[in-house]
Amino acid sequence: MEETKSRFRRICVFCGSSSGNKTTYHDAALQLAHQLVERNIDLVYGGGSVGLMGLISQAVHDGGRHVLGIIPKSLAPREITGESIGEVITVSTMHQRKAEMGRQADAFIALPGGYGTFEELLEVITWSQLGIHTKPVGLLNVDGFYDSLLTFIDKAVDEGFVSSTARRIIVSAPNAPQLLQLLEEYVPKHDDFVSKMVWDNTTDAFTLEGDSF
C-alpha cells in the first residue's frame, strides 16, 4: 500500500467499547484504520479489545503500525478480552487515561461512542479552548451521528456561551479521508484571553503525576 505523508505521527481515536447497531459504524472504523496505515500514522486509543476500540486497534496493528492503548486497571477485565493489542499502558484513573492519551497524540478523532467518548472529546476541546494544547480535534460524523451535538454547540454559540472562535476548534466530516484532510489543514485559533493565560508548564501539560493535565 502506498504511504501518504502526514504531519501527524500519532492520532488518538476516541470510540465506543460497543460496536453500535449499524454496520456503517463498523465500516467507518475500518476505513479510518486503513487511512491511518496508508498515511503512516500510529494509533493511540483507550486500550480495549472490544467494540469499535477493538476493531480499529486490530486493523491498525494488522496494517503494521504501532498501537498504544491506555486503560485504567479497573476497566481492563471488562474492556480487554483475550490478548491485548499492541502496547498497553495501565493507569489508575480515568483522568490519567485522558492525560496520557493527550500527551501521546498529535491530533484527536472521535468515532461514534457513548458517554466515555463524549467526555473524552469534550475535555480535549476544552483543553484547546484554554490554550493547553493546539492539536486538531475531529469528529467522524458517520451517518450524521454527531449532527445533534454540533447543533447543540451551535446553539451555545448563538446564546453566547461558546465563542465563534472556540466553535472552530472542532472539524467534522462524514468519512475518514475528508476528516484527515481537514485535520492536516487545521490552523489553531484562540480567543484573545487565551494568549494572556499562563500555565505552569504548557510543554508538560499532559502528565500522569498528581492531578495535573
Curated annotation (Swiss-Prot):
Expressed in roots and shoots. Detected in root hairs. SUPFAM superfamilies: MCP/YpsA-like. Its main location: cytoplasm. The keyword Cytoplasm applies. Substrate binds at residues 79, 97-98, 114-120, 126. Disruption phenotype: No visible phenotype under normal growth conditions; due to the redundancy with other LOG proteins. GO terms for molecular function: cytokinin riboside 5'-monophosphate phosphoribohydrolase activity. Keywords: Cytokinin biosynthesis, Cytoplasm, Hydrolase, Nucleus. It catalyses: N(6)-(dimethylallyl)adenosine 5'-phosphate + H2O = N(6)-dimethylallyladenine + D-ribose 5-phosphate; 9-ribosyl-trans-zeatin 5'-phosphate + H2O = trans-zeatin + D-ribose 5-phosphate. It comes from the Eukaryota. GO terms for biological process: cytokinin biosynthetic process. One of its GO terms (cellular component) is nucleus. It is found in: Cytoplasm; Nucleus. Pfam families: Lysine_decarbox (PF03641). Its EC number is 3.2.2.n1. InterPro entries: LOG, LOG_fam. Optimum pH is 6.5. Cytokinin-activating enzyme working in the direct activation pathway. Phosphoribohydrolase that converts inactive cytokinin nucleotides to the biologically active free-base forms. Belongs to the LOG family. PANTHER family: CYTOKININ RIBOSIDE 5'-MONOPHOSPHATE PHOSPHORIBOHYDROLASE LOG2, LOG FAMILY PROTEIN YJL055W. This is Cytokinin riboside 5'-monophosphate phosphoribohydrolase LOG2. It comes from Arabidopsis thaliana. The gene is LOG2.
